């Protein structure tokens, strides 16, 4: 629930200079170097390239083809059955072809889906940024706390050792009983165990810090002093409205539902006709024993209607309908979870 108001917290939190310099430096380091965050940025780049690929389907395609063959005629007869003169040829053919798709009912839906994909990738990136910033703050404060606990436990062990030495002298003088001295030894053993645990927590917290934020050069530079002033919504209704606008889980579910709708349109378009137009110019040399060169232009219009393919396309439509229903249920669940979370956070 802390994450719900993280944007507001980051906007309205003010800290003392020493803490701000170190914490903000750590947050900046995490923002630029965190592996999960960089992976999400690459995912956004992938979505942008997918959109470019889809745009290319609206543009004509051009290709150059060249082929050379060797033709050896073993036998050649004329109409009367006699042998004809054999002239072997080695034709060389080069062609240039330009083709443009004129009608494709799924092309527009695919383009819109890819545009939604960019918005979806951006929302996931924003969500990951907030998650990493939140984890970085937890890692920073967790390491500061672990170091302080280690120091407190170290001082406690030193105190117990001093007390043990004092009680040993008192035992020799008969001022305390053996049972009292044993209790002091037991207390020292407990303090040492807590100190070892605190040392382990420092190691664990340091590893977590370096995993989330990056390399830690000097632990002594970490500061714990902080004064924060957080602006919170004025009412529960205001909090719910803000969460509807800013909750990334809800936005992601909405965008995934829109993508599922486009998938249905794309699947249905596979059953619709498509049309293309192409222009090809070819050049041939040593074409045959009769002709040496040929230059030919071919203008071709093609219409295709794949109305049946063994039921595969209809099954794909049914599958995408089920995916859309699932995404709608996930969106409803995200909205309810968001409302429950905000209400619970406000009550606490």
Segments from the language model and where they lie:
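Periplasmic alpha-helical coiled-coil/stalk elements that build and connect Gram-negative outer-membrane
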Residues: 21, 131-245, 256, 345-348
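Small/polar (Gly/Ser/Thr/Ala-rich) solvent-exposed segments
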Residues: 38, 61-84, 88, 99-127, ...
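Amphipathic alpha-helical coiled-coil segments
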Residues: 39-54, 128, 132-153, 162, ...
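Hydrophobic, lipid-facing positions within transmembrane beta-strands of outer-membrane proteins
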Residues: 60, 92-96, 239, 297-303, ...
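Surface positions of alpha-helical coiled-coils, especially the charged/polar e/g heptad sites
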Residues: 22, 29, 36, 103, ...
């Amino acid at each position: 629930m802390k994450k719900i108001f993280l944007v507001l917290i980051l906007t309205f939190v003010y800290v003392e200079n020493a803490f701000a310099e170190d914490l903000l430096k750590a947050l900046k380091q995490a923002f630029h170097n965190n592996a999960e965050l960089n992976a999400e940025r690459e995912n956004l780049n992938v979505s942008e390239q997918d959109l470019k690929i889809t745009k290319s389907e609206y543009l004509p395609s051009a290709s150059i083809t060249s082929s050379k063959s060797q033709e050896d005629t073993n036998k050649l007869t004329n109409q009367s059955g006699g042998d004809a003169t054999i002239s072997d040829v080695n034709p060389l053919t080069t062609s240039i072809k330009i083709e443009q798709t004129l009608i494709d009912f799924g092309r527009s839906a695919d383009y819109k889906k890819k545009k939604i994909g960019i918005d979806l990738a951006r929302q996931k990136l924003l969500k990951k940024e907030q998650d990493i910033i939140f984890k970085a703050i937890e890692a920073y404060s967790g390491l500061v706390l672990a170091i302080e606990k280690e120091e407190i436990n170290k001082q406690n062990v030193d105190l117990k050792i001093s007390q043990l030495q004092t009680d040993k002298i008192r035992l020799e003088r008969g001022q305390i009983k053996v049972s009292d001295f044993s209790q002091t030894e037991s207390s020292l053993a407990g303090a040492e165990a807590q100190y070892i645990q605190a040392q382990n927590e420092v190691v664990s917290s340091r590893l977590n810090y370096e995993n989330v934020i990056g390399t830690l050069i000097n632990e002594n530079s970490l500061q714990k002093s902080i004064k924060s002033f957080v602006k919170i919504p004025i009412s529960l209704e205001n909090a719910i409205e803000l969460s509807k606008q800013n909750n990334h889980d809800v936005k992601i579910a909405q965008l995934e539902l829109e993508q599922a709708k486009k998938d249905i349109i794309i699947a249905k378009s596979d059953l619709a006709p498509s049309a293309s137009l192409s222009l090809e110019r070819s050049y041939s040399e040593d074409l045959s024993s009769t002709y040496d060169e040929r230059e030919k232009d071919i203008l071709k219009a093609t219409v295709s209607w794949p109305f049946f393919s063994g039921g595969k396309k209809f099954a794909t439509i049914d599958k995408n309908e089920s995916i859309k229903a699932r995404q709608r249920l996930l969106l409803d669940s995200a909205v309810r979870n968001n409302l429950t979370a905000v209400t619970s956070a406000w009550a606490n």
